[in-house]
């Protein structure tokens, strides 16, 4: 029993039952934890567009929208859909800026400056997120197909080869795109290196799409020397394109039709494989875009590679479709994708 000083016994007993004395110390009380103010979050909608003139706003003629781009506002992010639109459902209230994940952009595209925005935005607000392409004075959305008779489209039913299909898929994906034909039949890669400057000046393409070297095999000096002048010539083409602001896209050499054994198809395909090894390494060194057409042909044709050809070297429509698919994949895939 706790005895309270000055209490009579019967009072002390009562105090014991009550559990306290007038001057006994009380137990420490816990300090209340302040309740944090809830974080307010609001939706922000936007669209990723190709800002052709770098003015930060969508002009009437700027039709290209970029799918698959990851855009972040604060600690929240969303990926743009097929029409370039995105919705961040829960952006944090306050002043914020948007940013794009570089690895989600296609090769050579850069994220443009975006002014700060207030969250929540006003009703009906759509954030226009600009991305750019460093093409200087070249013509936006114009692709120059550069090569020999395969680029011309020999063997295809419509005479367009891969160009028509590539143009169609680019327009369907970006919203714009035209492919110009600068192929010259029967030319070698060294001849292509000599003439590309004139083509670039005349066409002024945003992209230069190169497939050159198939006819180099016809030069006796090249036949038994893998790559011969092929790699140095294609390297020169890359430099010419880059010097005027055109984005270089290089395709590996497609195989030849293995059924034409009387035209040394086996030996020629060995040469193609060895040459492509050097082309891949060179393109990586130069920092250009690589489209692995040879890998696309072998994946599609398998053990029936001859089904992709109309003669000993020219593809049929199915073969040209493979070329268009691989060029399209190289141009549009995110730079951080596993295919690169």
Residue ranges, per PLM feature:
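Catalytic His-Asp segment of secreted/periplasmic serine-dependent ester chemistry enzymes
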Residues: 255-340
């Amino acid at each position: 029993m706790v005895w309270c000083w000055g209490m009579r016994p019967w009072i002390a007993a009562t105090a014991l039952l009550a559990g306290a004395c007038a001057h006994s110390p009380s137990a420490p009380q816990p300090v209340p934890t302040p309740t944090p103010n809830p974080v307010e979050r609001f939706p922000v909608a936007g669209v990723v567009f190709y800002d052709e003139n770098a003015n930060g706003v969508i002009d009437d003629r700027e039709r290209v929208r970029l799918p698959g781009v990851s855009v972040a506002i604060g600690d929240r992010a969303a990926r743009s859909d097929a029409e370039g639109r995105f919705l961040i459902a829960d952006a944090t209230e306050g002043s914020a800026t948007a940013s794009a994940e570089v690895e989600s952009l296609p090769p050579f595209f850069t994220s443009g400056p975006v002014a700060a925005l207030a969250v929540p935005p006003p009703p009906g607000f759509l954030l226009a997120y600009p991305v750019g392409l460093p093409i200087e004075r070249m013509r936006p959305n114009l692709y120059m197909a550069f090569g020999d008779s395969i680029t011309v489209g020999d063997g295809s039913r419509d005479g367009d080869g891969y160009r028509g299909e590539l143009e169609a898929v680019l327009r369907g994906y970006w919203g714009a795109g035209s492919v110009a034909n600068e192929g010259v039949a029967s030319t070698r890669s060294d001849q292509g290196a000599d003439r590309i400057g004139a083509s670039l000046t005349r066409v002024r393409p945003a992209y230069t799409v190169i497939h050159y070297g198939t006819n180099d095999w016809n030069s006796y000096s090249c036949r038994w020397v893998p790559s011969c002048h092929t790699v140095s010539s294609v390297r020169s083409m890359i430099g010419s394109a880059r010097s005027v602001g055109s984005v270089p896209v290089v395709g590996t050499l497609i195989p030849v039709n293995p059924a034409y054994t009387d035209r040394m198809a086996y030996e020629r395909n060995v040469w193609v494989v060895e040459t492509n090894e050097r082309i891949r390494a060179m393109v990586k060194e130069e920092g250009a875009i690589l489209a692995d057409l040879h890998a696309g042909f072998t994946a599609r044709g398998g053990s029936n590679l001859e089904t992709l050809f109309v003669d000993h070297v020219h593809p049929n429509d199915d073969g040209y479709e493979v070329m268009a698919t691989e060029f399209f994949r190289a141009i549009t895939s995110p730079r951080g994708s596993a295919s690169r």
